[in-house]
Amino acid sequence: SASRESSVSTPATPDRSTMGSGASSMAEHYAEHAKYGTIAEAKEKLGADTVSKYVKENRYNELLPSPAGAKYTMCVVEFNVPGAKNGGTDKGPNGHRIDSIPIANGVVKAGGACEIIKYYHDKHDEFAKAVEKYDALIVRINPGQLSQGTTEGTQQRFDDLMNSLIAKGKPVWSSPGVQTKMGAKDALVKIANMKCGLVDTFAYYDAEALGTMFKKTMAFQPRVIKQNRGSAGEGIWLCWLEGKDYCKTFGEASLDDTDKLKLMEMNDNHVEYHTVKEFLTFCNDGPDAPGAGKWESTFPGKYLEGGKEAGGQLVDQRFLPRISEGEVRVLMSGDVVQMIIHKKPEGGLSAVGGNSAYTYFKPGCEEYKLLEESLKADIPKLLDAMNLSGEPLPLLWTADFIPKDAEDGTPGVTEYVVGEFNCSCVGVSKFQAVCGGEKTLADVPDEDYYDACKLTDLMGVQAIKMIKAAKGE
């Protein structure tokens, strides 16, 4: 269905116990004079939750018209996979991602102009000319989609174009550099000495480095080996030494090929037992290679295939036993925390997919106050650490944290370290529930719609803020 005809209203008897009279009168003022920009201004000044008590916002299932004379213009960029139903599993019957319209509308509500445009691999030059007029681009293309049904080199041509816009001072979210550097597992090595990092983190890009170093780290303590590719716990292995004691200090011992390991893959928590040589062979050459042994994992291994340039890498970190308490996901828009989510595993140690229960917390909550403060202290240094100086933070990204005891041994203190960044076309979960098939944005329940729009509206405000910063305003 099209946009709902709706009005702005206020409760008959506002609950003034939750806010001062000045705040309530200001909220009521915005309610009476509701325009896209003033609603965004109200949220920025009073907070989204406060404004929602007094302002019943419209629901829009279609793209809003951009305000006349908007100072900043943006576009949401999509790609439809040739021959795929709806243009891909992330699209609805109208050919759009379910979250594209709310993201574009978030920009409009914040006072900017925004359109949704498509990238066609056979109309690259036409697209390149069209995007010159925009102040910034919000790219909503899933990783790997540009290699489906397209001519060879499409991804590189698209990335080169995005980088050329960045060189002209135009933000692109998320840029190719941010996706490949911040989104890669070896980002954990680059933040190892920051508050959110784990000091004994190593990256391997070839078989020799993997074999030499892993035998030393594994001889000292339980480890976690993470592949760069894959998702939902695939290729993330918890590793324990089986039938042999760990050495007392790092570097004093190195394992033999015949030493035995207990391994748990995080995608489904299944356990396997292999020799060191079998595990290294699996990581390098796959389960069918000579000397790999017999594997229950249904995935192909070969984690270093293609080398560093192709994303072939493994990261080696200390195993943190408190992962059994679950992971903490921080959902961000630029430098602003939008939500904190505790993912508690239901059986096993993995908090992926349907194996976990979710509890949601608002920014500033007491439970994760120290985590939030620590993250905010690191954010200004984050992109520099990854050789991304001058790039804007992703417009939508997540950081998954694992709890641990204090590094200095202080009893009763919990610290958190990043296990993964995600900044490649992060989906908006409340919209994704109706993703694909014949359902559209109109099929999202009201409660989920308004909750998800808190995020997309924040993205609009943040996008304009980052454009201003890029222009030096």
Which residue ranges define each predicted feature?
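Repeat-associated, polar segments at repeat-unit boundaries in modular proteins
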Residues: 43-65
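C-terminal active-site "lid" helix and adjoining low-complexity regulatory extension at the edge
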Residues: 366-369, 377, 384-395, 403-473
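Phosphate-binding site of ATP-dependent enzymes
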Residues: 234, 238-389, 402-411
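Structural motif
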Residues: 138-140, 224, 315
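Conserved N-proximal alpha/beta basic substrate-recognition cap immediately N-terminal to
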Residues: 79-85, 89-218, 231
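Phospho-regulated RS/SR low-complexity segments
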Residues: 3, 7-9
